[in-house]
């Protein structure tokens, strides 16, 4: 006699096992940890397991997470500014002044936005440095990896980040913004034959005016953020597709694959294995329980700490560091000296000293220092994964011996950029003369 089926009531989880956020602080099994990812859309960015080594704070310094948190802060702080700012040469400055001095918490929101923009440039650059110095752009032991293309995308994302900050620089429409953008766009005009056309396309005319402001405004609030968001999503998908951080590759390469115990009575008819036999399963070290942890909750927890820590740090900094607002933009009064944004000051410094005379032929310093040299640097940086001949054992290793020479050259270039940036920021005075940081500048009126 067949007994009737009786529905059994599911037993509730013990108190404290699952949190209201949809994941467990202490999962009872790997399956429960994996189910948290499968059942929550927000956690789909995380793999089921991650390498313990790649979780270390001192390996990646979580610079990618910090960069993403700063991008989120830029969007969050930019939304109220979007409703308050007026992109008009007649009203832009006054609307920013109202945000700064009239709107409740307006000064703090603007400071958060500005600090986040500057810190994002630094964080993305440091993230790129970390990837280079660890050789994380090289493929490891896994099949189907394309880390080199993710590196190329990272270089493009750095350039977009710089341009995103540069387009926002003009929006306050004060003297600092107007002349910084003037200096920056003048470098583009130094390209032979096409330079003036490139500059006109960039600023919408021959002078910086209403068309320039509208172009920079649309680029800053729509096109560049959307493009950067799409690239970030693909970048993270590619990281997961390539097996996570390159540090995990070291564990897979240094440890020999282990053979699973053979159970002669096991059968897998779907695979065509004959009865009485069993396949030999080889597991890489990255898959071993002793070298991995569950992404939920370990990776999620550390991601939350890095994100919230970044947001808190920026919020506190914005209390003490106000955003500057100088006099309204005036094309007839040139500040002395007129400087590019700080992240382009190293280029302005090179431009000053790179005019080359070859007989009757003269190479413009703006073209040499502002186009040729940075173009070569970006080109080499982009192509380096294919030029680097180091072994896979150097992948994911800080300052690997086989990469000592290229790391040294890379660091020398970075140090040179930092020195030039410092000189341009702290040591250039009126008429672009050199002064010690503690030395007073002479009283020289602005150029009219």
Q: Can you describe what each PLM-predicted range is?
A:
Residues 52-68, 133-158, 175, 179-183, ...:
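Membrane-interfacial loop-to-helix junctions in multi-pass inner-membrane proteins
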Residues 214-215, 219-223, 228-334:
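Long, contiguous internal "core" modules enriched in hydrophobic/ aromatic residues
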Residues 66-76, 114-129, 368-385:
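Hydrophobic alpha-helical transmembrane segments
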Residues 23, 27, 42-62, 106, ...:
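Cytosolic juxtamembrane amphipathic/interface segments immediately preceding
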Residues 30-34, 48-59, 63, 312-448:
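Aromatic-capped, Gly/Pro-kinked transmembrane alpha-helices
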Residues 67-79, 155-186, 305-332, 412-426:
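Hydrophobic alpha-helical membrane-insertion segments
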Residues 5-39, 81-88, 112-137, 151-152, ...:
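Transmembrane-helix bundle segments that line or gate the permeation/cavity pathway
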Residues 53, 81-112, 169-216, 322-364, ...:
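Membrane-interface interhelical loops and short amphipathic "cap" helices
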């Amino acid at each position: 006699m067949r007994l009737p089926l009786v529905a059994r009531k599911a037993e509730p989880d013990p108190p404290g096992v699952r949190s209201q956020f949809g994941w467990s602080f202490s999962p009872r099994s790997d399956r429960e940890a994996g189910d948290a990812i499968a059942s929550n859309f927000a956690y789909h960015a995380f793999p089921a397991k991650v390498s313990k080594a790649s979780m270390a704070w001192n390996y990646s310094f979580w610079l990618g997470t910090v960069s993403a948190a700063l991008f989120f802060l830029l969007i969050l702080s930019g939304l109220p500014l979007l409703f308050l700012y007026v992109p008009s040469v007649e009203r832009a400055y006054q609307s920013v002044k109202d945000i700064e001095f009239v709107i409740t918490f307006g000064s703090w929101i603007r400071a958060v936005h500005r600090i986040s923009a500057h810190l994002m440039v630094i964080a993305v650059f440091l993230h790129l440095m970390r990837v280079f110095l660890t050789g994380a752009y090289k493929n490891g032991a896994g099949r189907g990896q394309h880390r080199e293309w993710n590196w190329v995308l990272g270089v493009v994302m750095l350039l977009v980040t710089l341009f995103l900050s540069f387009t926002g620089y003009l929006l306050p429409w004060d003297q600092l913004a107007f002349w910084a953008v003037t200096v920056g766009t003048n470098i583009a005009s130094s390209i032979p034959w096409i330079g003036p056309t490139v500059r006109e396309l960039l600023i919408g005319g021959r002078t910086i005016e209403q068309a320039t402001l509208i172009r920079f405004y649309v680029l800053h609030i729509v096109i560049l953020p959307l493009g950067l968001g799409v690239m970030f999503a693909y970048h993270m998908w590619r990281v997961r597709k390539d097996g996570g951080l390159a540090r995990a590759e070291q564990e897979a390469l240094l440890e020999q694959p282990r053979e699973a115990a053979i159970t002669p009575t096991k059968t897998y008819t779907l695979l065509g294995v004959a009865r009485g036999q069993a396949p030999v399963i080889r597991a890489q070290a990255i898959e071993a329980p002793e070298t991995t942890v569950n992404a939920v909750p370990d990776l999620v927890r550390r991601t939350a700490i890095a994100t919230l820590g970044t947001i808190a740090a920026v919020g506190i900094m914005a209390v003490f560091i106000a955003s500057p607002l100088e006099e309204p933009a005036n094309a007839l009064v040139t500040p002395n000296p007129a400087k590019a944004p700080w992240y382009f000051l190293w280029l302005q410094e090179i431009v000053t000293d790179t005019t080359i005379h070859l007989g009757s032929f003269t190479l413009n310093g703006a073209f040499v220092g502002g186009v040729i040299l940075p173009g070569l640097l970006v080109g080499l940086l982009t192509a380096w994964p294919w030029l680097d001949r180091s072994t896979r054992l150097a992948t994911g290793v800080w300052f690997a011996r086989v990469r000592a020479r290229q790391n040294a050259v890379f660091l020398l270039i970075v140090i040179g950029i930092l020195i030039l940036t410092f000189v341009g920021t702290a040591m250039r005075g009126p008429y672009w003369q050199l002064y010690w940081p503690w030395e007073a500048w002479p009283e020289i009126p602005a150029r009219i």
